[in-house]
Amino acid sequence: MYKTMKATHYIYVLFAALFTLVCAGCEDRLNIEKHGSLGGPENYYQTDEEAEAAVASMLISWRDMYSNWFYVKNCLSDDAYTGGGSRGDNAMMEQLNEFTFFTDNGLISGLYSGLYAVVYKANLIIENVTGDSSVMRRAVAEAKFYRAWAYFELVTLWGNAPLVDHLLTPSEYHVSNSTPEALWAFVEQNLEEAISSGALPSKANVDDADATSRVTLETAKAYLGKAYLFQGKYSDAATVLDEVIDSKKYELYQGSFDMLGHAVTNNCSESMLEVQRRKNSEQAWNQFVQFYIMLGWRTSHMSYGPKALFEEGIAMGTYGFFNPTKSLYDAFVEREGVDGYRLKSTMRTYEQMNEVEMAINPGLYLVGNEGYFFWKTRLLGSDNIIDQSWFQSLQYTNLRVMRYAEVLLMAAEAHVMGGGSADKAVKYINEIRTRAKLAPLSSVTLDDVKKEKRLELCLESVRFQDLVRWGDAKAVLGEQGKFIPAYGYFPKIDPSTGEVMKDAQGNPIFEFKLEPENTKNSVYGFQDKHMLLPIPYTELNVNPNIKQNTGW
């Protein structure tokens, strides 16, 4: 199996090689037309069209690192087991999920280099697009936003990553570590400059999907608020996040909750930031990303009845990674009960899967599974770019990065922790709960925020960094990976002989069950060193000025 999409760009890559590689095939990634021919930096970036092409190239790099971004952050959380077809199906994901990874983990190195590829493309725009047209000023503002976005991930995951604020000359390639303080200041500066530039538009109204396909003023403010929140600047966070909310340009999607991760809600009223996709059959394979294949259930191990295929429209040809944990299910039940609307829209029990004619095939079992299945990330045939029953993973669902629900939850936390408006904290949380068909709360604590955020945004790439900043990671993740469950059909063992029982024809007898300790690991769980990810060894090998994070 193809296991990872590794970026190979480093912060010291030569301009010519990288620029030539990524400036082709941009038209279908965003609503940006690309015209003209490529030249060197001395005669490029002179027109609006060239500025837009440079933005499209930056967004291709952003798209290309998305899968690694999603895998790393969600494997490190307690929302899901790795899953897959068998133990070892994707060893790098298992290492992350069980905290047994080292400096050579390909997903970590792919994310690290992918983030710096985005930084490099942003630096190209910021330094070379110098015109004063509205298109060029917007290009620079967007570049500053994405540079800040990349450094938010670098500082929260690596802490001491190198700060590259300009295009490097050969003598500067060996950049040394920065500090969290310097990186946070850089994130704030870039977002503040993007916001104050006047070049980022606001949506015309909550349903303005065209504006949502690009970075808006409110999106930049949302990320500035997030940066403040992570630094404990609660009053500042509350102020800027309130501005996003008070703009009334965004609202929670009021359709079916289980469609929030599907094409019908691309750039909807709740969308803050998404990697754009296009339903263009001529560009279908050019838009292929591994992400969708990984999320769907394990087609080879399961049967799909007519109800699943035709009434629910479930897509086939997927690999079955990311199975929800019982811990996540129990958290839902505690908050909503076993019949909770948001629970059933997010995940299903095996019995509920049977109701839609989904079943594990006799003689097979699912590794990293406790009998629960994500429903919110199910693949649908209606989301396919092209209609082909044998392979339904060419989806045009936008890749979600932030939605408005996260803004409400962050704002509530900022008010609670900063001694701000208790009424606003209650109002924001109750907007989330009302959509989830839950009774409103009369007061809100940090514990309420934590619980609501886990349920609302599970498997949406926020949980691990939240656990770390809250100081909860060791308590929550310390035992993760000790046991890996499996669910399905297992050979029935004769307790008196220890041998597999057989029927009259000599065939093995299977029993359907959960094996909670199908795999037992001697090394597992979050340790102090996992507060920061390791700098990839590939970077250490080529840059003598980088020092490794503590414990690695």
Give residue spans per PLM region:
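Elongated scaffold/linker segments in the mid-to-C-terminal portions of large proteins
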Residues: 49-50, 55, 66, 89-110, ...
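Membrane-proximal, proline-rich intrinsically disordered regions
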Residues: 26-73, 541-552
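Conserved, well-structured interaction surfaces
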Residues: 47-64, 87-158, 173-181, 191-201, ...
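Structural register within alpha-helical repeat arrays
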Residues: 140, 147, 217, 224, ...
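TPR-repeat structural position
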Residues: 234, 421-422
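Short, surface-exposed recognition loops and adjoining beta-strand edges that mediate ligand/DNA contacts
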Residues: 42, 68-85, 164-167, 200-223, ...
